[in-house]
Amino acid sequence: MIVLILCLLLFSYNSVICTSNNDCVQGNVTQLPGNENIIKDFLFHTFKEEPSVVVGGYYPTEVWYNCSRSATTTAYKDFSNIHAFYFDMEAMENSTGNARGKPLLVHVHGDPVSIIIYISAYRDDVQPRPLLKHGLLCITKNKIIDYNTFTSAQWSAICLGDDRKIPFSVIPTDNGTKIFGLEWNDDYVTAYISDRSHHLNINNNWFNNVTILYSRSSSATWQKSAAYVYQGVSNFTYYKLNNTNGLKSYELCEDYEYCTGYATNVFAPTVGGYIPHGFSFNNWFMRTNSSTFVSGRFVTNQPLLVNCLWPVPSFGVAAQQFCFEGAQFSQCNGVSLNNTVDVIRFNLNFTALVQSGMGATVFSLNTTGGVILEISCYNDTVSESSFYSYGEISFGVTDGPRYCFALYNGTALKYLGTLPPSVKEIAISKWGHFYINGYNFFSTFPIDCISFNLTTGDSGAFWTIAYTSYTDALVQVENTAIKKVTYCNSHINNIKCSQLTANLQNGFYPVASSEVGLVNKSVVLLPSFYSHTSVNITIDLGMKRSGYGQPIASTLSNITLPMQDNNTDVYCIRSNRFSVYFHSTCKSSLWDDVFNSDCTDVLYATAVIKTGTCPFSFDKLNNYLTFNKFCLSLNPVGANCKFDVAARTRTNEQVVRSLYVIYEEGDNIVGVPSDNSGLHDLSVLHLDSCTDYNIYGITGVGIIRQTNSTLLSGLYYTSLSGDLLGFKNVSDGVIYSVTPCDVSAHAAVIDGAIVGAMTSINSELLGLTHWTTTPNFYYYSIYNYTNERTRGTAIDSNDVDCEPIITYSNIGVCKNGALVFINVTHSDGDVQPISTGNVTIPTNFTISVQVEYIQVYTTPVSIDCSRYVCNGNPRCNKLLTQYVSACQTIEQALAMGARLENMEIDSMLFVSENALKLASVEAFNSTETLDPIYKEWPNIGGSWLGGLKDILPSHNSKRKYRSAIEDLLFDKVVTSGLGTVDEDYKRCTGGYDIADLVCAQYYNGIMVLPGVANDDKMAMYTASLAGGITLGSLGGGAVSIPFAIAVQARLNYVALQTDVLNKNQQILANAFNQAIGNITQAFGKVNDAIHQTSQGLATVAKVLAKVQDVVNTQGQALSHLTLQLQNNFQAISSSISDIYNRLDELSADAQVDRLITGRLTALNAFVSQTLTRQAEVRASRQLAKDKVNECVRSQSQRFGFCGNGTHLFSLANAAPNGMIFFHTVLLPTAYETVTAWSGICASDGDRTFGLVVKDVQLTLFRNLDDKFYLTPRTMYQPIVATSSDFVQIEGCDVLFVNATVIDLPSIIPDYIDINQTVQDILENFRPNWTVPELPLDIFNATYLNLTGEINDLEFRSEKLHNTTVELAILIDNINNTLVNLEWLNRIETYVKWPWYVWLLIGLVVIFCIPILLFCCCSTGCCGCIGCLGSCCHSICSRRQFESYEPIEKVHVH
């Protein structure tokens, strides 16, 4: 049926004839001329590894079909249930580009994207393109494909917008010898086109069916036309490829178990030692010396660079040896490298779910010094010193616990632990680390070689041995195993690593800073006369054996300091420069404490000096550390800290002594690497290269350059942010500048490749050599800027003619890397739009009531910082004072935030007594307070009372001023943590109950305070808003009017645009009442319907979910804050009292300091979350105020602000921590689509100007008759545009302003950076504190009681069925609220005045016109009366002029 419908659709569009299998005949492409090796060429073209590899996939190994037809019509065929599709050309004329064949279209169906391969052989399509480039692969999101566009239109009309296009050639040199095709899965697509394979990362749901459209006349000659053969592949096959010394062979791999294991575990490393893309990483694990990563994506340094991969199907009984140095890579699969081998990885693949190791297996580690340690495991515990039974490491799944030991000559040196239940990988590093499944199982001295013997028997074992080196890579881990690797080995991959994604979308990305690595060290010091002291420390280790033969370092080991003042216990530095060195010796004894023999074998040990409690390391003392005083002592008296001296054996480290340090901070004494006595300037400068510098005590990494500047004052110069800008060499006065090693740059990435980069300096980067300049940056690109007009000059839009793929401000970057301006419009005497876009304008409406919840306030929280951190311990409180004002800052931040919020809420919530009296169903239907003219109305509430009874408060509800919906909301919500403040606090202070989480919060200084707003006040506020709607809605008055008239006043505004007449009000009222009734039922039944909620209840469900989240978020945060008291933050205990009981005061202070740091960090995280939440609520509160003013108190003219539609009126109800708005809107049901113009760009010769519409509520569009019209956006009412509707603007360019976060305060004055506020808190802490990792992503979430009802419904099928039936009825009722209004298609609307207004106007005209005529005609010097008077006066006397006084110049001061 589907195929028939599709055929009919295709026929209707393209006159397509659907063919059946009878129209296609089987063919064999290898029988065509030159196609004997087509399969081999295809496989080896895709996989170039050497020497052998097994590949699996959906390869073209099935039947080929030739579907050529005798008629010249276009034909259609479907391929179903396939995972790959291939096609090949039988022949095509090898011309100069004008192919004479017919087109082919291949459509791979999927969601959300589909892929189309289109081969156009028409002369018109080929001519404007490069020769032989008339194939196109299009990745499109279009759901409906118009095949006629592809088979007739030019390429410029197809694959538009965001569709990805890959053009390719389809006429190879040897006709018909190349296979084209697609292979797909849910993660990526492989396209075999243009003599290469494209790996496209596409996450998609493929339907596994393909549609092809083709056309070929069988009457055409072989030399003049093309015929295609097709193959859809549904079977997964394996091939074994061998490529040795250029000799290529292949064979079908039919042993499924062998082929699967080989293809899964064996690969051929590519050039450089990289693991090829697509490898499964079966049983490859991350190396870790601490915790194991479960899942995630991160950049790490791992042994993933393969120097040699040795596939081993099975081992014999003989022992195998593998060495790190001088390894012979004679059996490598693929390339082999001579790099240093860091880790040898044994990757194991076992198909049997039983114990796989059939014989004895012992790993022998040849460590430094020739001592061989053995790693073996036993199935029971062994208590004797000699292990008479032979152990083994069982590979695969073990049948019981295995206890592992490190052995030497049959003696257990160390118990390692229990072997994992399933051993999949063993990795051994040359530095002595032994990993099992990625975990560091054992560490010893560096290892030279590894040997072991293994018998796999018939277990189906399959091995690979990889000689690997460490490299940086982006690793994706799933369930602790590696799933995908992206090497950070190129410019584009470095960006991928910095963005933590293997697939980069088109756009601009910051260029990751290159790792500095090992660089020269520059030191700048003041010249001085140096006296130097060399301190040589000798450590004599004493080693002996335990009763079981394990090596033990004696505490009688000796430390010798240089003699000073006949004292060898304390040595103080008395010079201004010093260097510290130590060397160790090792002596052993049998059982006593007389150490007079050299240490051999496992008794050999070396001395190491560990940091201990000092804030600096022993090996860093000679790295220019400065002190005022520095002494070494063997006694702890007066010491500031100590170094731990340990003996390091092949199995462990044992602390034998302590070396104490007495020091004072300062800069009089400096530790230096070597002796430089005398008058010296010890400064060492490395110019014009990246260097690690220490300049007058300021350290960093940068490039030092000599300048020509002259500055008389200062030694070094910094910016306002503290960065070092330059310094002066006091010896010669030369000024040097210091600049970063890396410059700021942004790379333009298109289709996974870097095509350009914007940088601040004119220097080549990212391998880009071609450049041009703009007013703001330099641009480097793959585009060849060699023209004199573009090289080094500002770019002009005429330089490059291309379509930008990505944009940055008003600049675009094309696929070829060219940079173009995108806001310049060129025209000559023609009218062009500034910008256009299709818009839909409604032509008819229905009514809808939409629910919206907005949070208004949060519950304030008070925290006693010292109580939370120290729980009243006096010693802890003393330590807490060292953190300066940390607690004060935390407490003030919470207090100020709470006060600010309370002030804002208090100013927002005000209640009108008059309005509150009317805010009830009873008052709306009462005539006591109304004007007498309304008392005769049968229903004061009007037609709208049926719906209002659930929104308006009722005196008969549980509480006064609450509506039915408010009662439902407050009854349904159950708060978590500290919701009911009074009840919880009273219960906790009783002391008779076991302290639960709520009590623990109060006991530890956390208390929720009652806020300004509560449920009753919010209910009164919203009720007052409802009552205020009917106060003075017709211009103001002391007496309320019926709600129906208030609503009618709101409808009058809409009537001016939508022709809503009075007779439609009853229709709207009925729809409103029905919608409100169904929403009320939805609030009551959403607990029964949350899992099967439909579209009709989606709004209500979302609102309740948001209410639940708002109410419980703070409780969850407080619960998590309290749970942090159980975290020990790497201390020995989470109890402060317990720590002081178990340790001495000094050690306990160090442990408690960790608790203080961790708990302050937890408080800071909570404060940061609270401040962020308050900022969000502040914005939400402002939004609520705006909606109250614009939606409730008035009628909004903004479309979508008060509900998604044309706003009529809104009512508000109180809800937990906020308000719920019920927006009554008109929703469009019919639309007219027009192409809107934002303006007109007109030119006349050299003059160019723009015209834009004056009224922003009007839309300018060009109709089908090529005439311009204006129409309101709210209703399609086209009128002819006039000149008065436009405003002229200067030009047509569209400009944008780029701003950084630093620039935002200058643009938005009230912008607050919350992160900076928290940073200010952290800066007040001690500088030497350490912040532990404190993830806040797991909360003890508490949900509404809806969840329990949902779970209960799952066990009551009968009730669920009934609920489903009720919901179906309810959904139908909601859907029935959509009503059609009467539509009158009127272009213009005239307002008619009543008859008495016209009568009044007539009387005024009759009275005023005679008076005006008399005044104008009879008065004045030229009037009738004036003329008559002048004549009479001139006859009787001569006209006299009045005398006047002369005017003098007056100066006013």
Curated annotation (Swiss-Prot):
This is Spike glycoprotein. Keywords: Coiled coil, Glycoprotein, Host membrane, Host-virus interaction, Membrane, Signal, Transmembrane, Transmembrane helix, Viral attachment to host cell, Viral envelope protein, Virion, Virulence, Virus entry into host cell. A motif (KxHxx) lies at residues 1449-1453. GO terms for cellular component: host cell endoplasmic reticulum-Golgi intermediate compartment membrane; membrane; viral envelope; virion membrane. Residues 1108-1152, 1342-1384 form a coiled coil. Residues 19-791, 32-780 are annotated as: S1. GO terms for biological process: endocytosis involved in viral entry into host cell; fusion of virus membrane with host endosome membrane; fusion of virus membrane with host plasma membrane; receptor-mediated virion attachment to host cell. Residues 1026-1047 are annotated as: Fusion peptide. The lineage of its organism: Viruses, Riboviria, Orthornavirae, Pisuviricota, Pisoniviricetes. Pfam families: CoV_S1, CoV_S1_C, CoV_S2, CoV_S2_C. The chain crosses the membrane at residues 1395-1414. It is found in: Virion membrane; Host endoplasmic reticulum-Golgi intermediate compartment membrane. Residues 781-1453, 794-1453 are annotated as: S2.
